[in-house]
Amino acid sequence: HYFGAIPTRVMAFMKDLEYECLKLGIPVKTRHNEVAPNQFELAPVYEEANLANDHNQLLMTIMDKIARRHQFRVLLHEKPFKGINGSGKHNNWSLGTDTGVNLFGTGKTASENLQFITFLVNAVSAVYKYNGLLKASIMSATNAHRLGANEAPPAIISAFLGSQVSACLLYTSDAA
């Protein structure tokens, strides 16, 4: 049951995993049940792309190691069972310059906010316009088994902006 109580054995595994991640400098958050039976979520916190890739590889290795200590097995396949939700393998990303400027970061001045809005609108437009190309470049064959609706993995690529950014864009469009 989504967001239900996590079974005691699983909670012990997750706490051990989070502790190992902390010791290794892998920033993680989120701990909850997923929709599919015996599926649980742990989310790495965003960081610089190369470091995030290294941390994801290390995370998958230690997940397997700690799972075995708890007499579990970890399935990292996107859709291990036909017709049952799998891992959506969400990908959250941002863009930055070589000097560390976050191009999707809001600013303190009108020109800094204009930069944010410009990059945001173009990124969302690209997700809409090049949806098929994005899917072809990021979906493995096994992650292409879509269930549709709100089931993981979904049949769509979406851009969730949150209420504050959505309100900012609405205000900007109304002011124009």
Language-model-detected regions and their locations in the chain:
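Flexible glycine/proline-rich, aromatic-decorated loop/lid segments
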Residues: G83, S87-T99
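Polar, glycine-rich mid-to-C-terminal structural blocks
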Residues: T118, A126-L170
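Conserved small/polar residues in nucleotide/adenosyl-binding loops
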Residues: Y171-A176
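Helical (often loop-to-helix) elements that flank the catalytic cores of nucleotide-handling enzymes
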Residues: L51-R68, L95-V127
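A short glycine-rich, hydrophobically flanked beta-strand micro-motif that places a catalytic Asp/Glu
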Residues: T30-N33, R73-F81
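Short, conserved phosphate-binding/catalytic loop or strand-edge motifs used
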Residues: E34-L42, S87-K89
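Carboxylate/His-rich catalytic cores and anion/metal-binding grooves
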Residues: H1-G25
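Short, hydrophobic beta-strand segments
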Residues: Q39-A49, W93
